[in-house]
């Protein structure tokens, strides 16, 4: 493309300038350097004095390239005339340029003398096309404004959905290429390569025509090395490398409106280059607003990221073809409502939560039942204080056994089947208690009930953690705790009007609706994947997410997570638990369980009536227990509304601080009362403190340890680790409830509450420094973060579709 250096005294007839026909006008070029700015000229080819029009052409059609066999003629010595060589040179030049859009000017316009050549050269230098630095800067501004600012901004606003609404062929290719996330990534890269060149002004290439005609001094026509990158092979296109930074782009935007208005005046529907470029861009950009739209019904698959709003930048669009009546139908899915309104997902959460209501009823049973059970006018057998303590304490002890066995059960039987299997033991246990003729029958019934409670308390959070979407896992994940509190409230209210036997019959009826609803919901997809039953996993996930949801991305993530866990798993489950990556989430879960029970909540629930009797409150003790139960119930529903807004840790902070204040207050009240002072004026204080204490506990430390157990434990060890955590929880429950009376006798009621308050202070520090926030994260994200690997959060929310015609 560039000739040899020449002296100023070359023959203009033999080595004349050439004029290149671009289709938009003519531009003058030389072999030493083609004026960069001529690519936007529209001049009169016959009049070098005409004023150039800048910005007349936005896009450029490919310019035909000639072969690289054309020899460059060596210039004659200065002053030498070679008229006979003119015809030969012209013939060779025309032969080498065959197929190129190059036209020679009339040769008689140039003088044959050296003086004439110099005049012509000066005339050309004076009028050549925008070769000054000022005009080059203008070119850069034009390119930056029109290419970078306009189209790139529009494209980024509409994002990458590479659908061609004008060509069914392009759409069908995209549909095939977007069948999976990996395929889509490859398709997306191709799309980035073929998208409109104006989207990135840093990488714009133009082809110049090859011209064999040498020019004069190279120093007069030195190309701008800051803008041009010239390959050794002159047949390759010249690359214009525009270094556009943010500051330059911002500065350029100030003149964008003027340039755009000028550009719009120059646009023409008859311009073939513009039409070609526009069609290409229409194929690449998102949801063209072109009037030439397809009549087909198109449906986009988009994904909702995070917990609060759509994150279009990181969302991956998915498109699939739906067959209707044997004919392909293209439809578009758009994210619409909150996942909380997917009724199948809510039904699954409600079904397992009814089991939690039975658990809550079982836990609260001893508080109202022991009073009537010790009454010989009601009970045919004697219940001593020692046997009464075992009626309250044997349930958590049996729950310990249930927690230990529950881990293997949910792995081998499945999450759903394990929960379902607890219904029958619940019914049998309550019937044993209701029909008891000896305290031993009551103990056996309580033990069987406690075993079922241990299994259920382990399997319920695991089931919900594996089926509910991350966006609403906090809200729906707290439903078991809320229904557990309903069970507690129901037991307290019924206990005011029923004796221990009637309460037991009521308890036997509660598992029946729970049993029936459990048959309607599926097993968790993750358990199916762990058993190699991917087809069943897909069906279960489809049921949970809705019939029209695209579950492929989520299913793929579940399978990948399971495969990663399998690669790092050992033969021994205990060895897996002891691995550093698994030990950290297990210890956090154990810590939460420890501080939950050592806050004294179960001791308070089990002995609520007795505590109010000891306090000497003027309010009826049974009414006090009902009030506490109502507050417990309401607080949990408040937590369900706040947990996905404030996060897990914030609710734990609030919960811990509330318990610390109220436990210390209760300790102070009992200290003053036991010292012999009159506390009748503040008889309301125990109830107020209890209400705030239960309110604080139910907001955080009540439901969140169980919720986070199902979230932070790795999938491969979730069953065994949850078994350990549940067993540990019930061990702490047993220790607290069984020793509560002994601790009161040893250090007094006031000392007992102060002890629990001090433990809550330590629990607050534990939450601050060790407990992670899991709000809005998928189980796979949480697992990778707990293992120390950082990854981009991915979340799959398959939303009810909204179809519209384009």
Curated annotation (Swiss-Prot):
GO terms for cellular component: plasma membrane. InterPro entries: MFS_dom (IPR020846), MFS_ERD6/Tret1-like (IPR044775), MFS_sugar_transport-like (IPR005828), MFS_trans_sf (IPR036259), MFS_Trehalose_Transporter (IPR050549), Sugar/inositol_transpt (IPR003663), Sugar_transporter_CS (IPR005829). The gene is Tret1. Residues 25-34 have a biased composition (Low complexity). The lineage of its organism: Eukaryota, Metazoa, Ecdysozoa, Arthropoda, Hexapoda. This is Facilitated trehalose transporter Tret1. High-capacity facilitative transporter for trehalose. Does not transport maltose, sucrose or lactose. Mediates the bidirectional transfer of trehalose. Responsible for the transport of trehalose synthesized in the fat body and the incorporation of trehalose into other tissues that require a carbon source, thereby regulating trehalose levels in the hemolymph. The chain crosses the membrane at residues 340-360, 390-410, 425-445, 448-468, 474-494, 502-522, 586-606, 623-643, 650-670, 682-702, 724-744, 751-771. GO terms for molecular function: sugar transmembrane transporter activity; trehalose transmembrane transporter activity.
